[in-house]
């Protein structure tokens, strides 16, 4: 009888250990490592976060951060470009493992996605055409028109302030619509607006209001299956922070270090 009990306990322990091992081996991070690549979604046309340079080489803050994370996890970075309004949908359906695209953390997004630690701290700004004296703050958007990327937090922000938002594909189109008077204003990241003005030399735009600091983080599908992936990404970001990689990327594209709150 004693021998039977010992044998039974051993079998139970063996099954339990096997179950635990299977769970670990079958989680998302393990599958990524087995396949050898991390599939990353980003826009590819949102300078300075992700864009093509004069030689059509994909570059930017998010591109370098994404590649740095993949390298530290020990896999290749497979970057897939897409429009903003499809990135988070693609994350939900499994098209991407993660999205690295200057994503800010909102309550609605937290219902569907888990987020890494922040890697950039930006601000959201309100931009109008020079001479637009009746819009001096976000509160003045009530009853006015803005242009923003479809499904973006900037679009949601404009609507929350009472604006009628025209959905467009990218920042350049937003700025063109403001410049030619089709819309009254646009809302976007301070870093992107500053980079656009610096790159184009346009002098007809004025920033009239800005938000508090906005942290950008990396979303992934919510659930236990991604716990180890989130931990690995946070570990990679911490290593990049400690060895100066994050700071160097920020200074390269923003001109200043925006990796600290």
Please report, for each region that a protein language model flagged, where it lies by residue:
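A ligand-binding cleft/hinge motif common to bilobed small-molecule-binding domains
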Residues: 86, 103-111, 157-160, 179, ...
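Extracytoplasmic small-molecule ligand-binding "clamshell" domains
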Residues: 24-102
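Periplasmic-binding protein-like
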Residues: 121-128, 190, 194-235, 256-261
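Extended ligand-binding regions for polar small-molecule ligands
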Residues: 21-23, 63-72, 150-152, 218-257
């Amino acid at each position: 009888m004693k021998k039977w009990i010992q044998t039974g306990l051993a079998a139970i322990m063996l099954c339990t250990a096997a179950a635990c091992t299977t769970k670990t081996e079958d989680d998302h991070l393990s599958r990524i490592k087995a396949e050898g690549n991390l599939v990353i979604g980003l826009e590819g046309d949102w300078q300075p976060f992700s864009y093509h340079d004069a030689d059509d080489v994909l570059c930017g803050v998010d591109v370098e951060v994404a590649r740095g994370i993949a390298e530290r996890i020990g896999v290749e970075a497979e970057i897939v470009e897409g429009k903003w309004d499809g990135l988070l949908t693609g994350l939900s359906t499994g098209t991407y493992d993660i999205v690295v695209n200057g994503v800010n953390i909102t309550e609605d997004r937290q219902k569907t996605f888990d987020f890494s630690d922040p890697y950039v701290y930006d601000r959201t700004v309100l931009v109008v055409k020079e001479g637009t004296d009746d819009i001096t703050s976000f509160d003045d958007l009530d009853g006015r028109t803005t242009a923003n990327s479809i499904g973006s937090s900037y679009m949601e922000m404009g609507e929350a302030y009472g604006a009628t938002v025209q959905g467009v594909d990218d920042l350049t189109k937003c700025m063109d619509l403001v410049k030619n008077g089709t819309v009254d204003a646009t809302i976007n990241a301070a870093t992107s607006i500053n980079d656009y003005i610096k790159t184009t030399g346009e002098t007809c735009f004025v920033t009239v209001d800005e938000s508090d600091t906005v942290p950008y983080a990396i979303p992934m599908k919510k659930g236990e299956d991604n716990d180890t992936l989130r931990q690995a990404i946070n570990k990679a970001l911490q290593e990049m922070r400690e060895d100066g990689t994050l700071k160097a990327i920020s200074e390269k594209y923003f001109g200043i270090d925006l990796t600290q709150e």
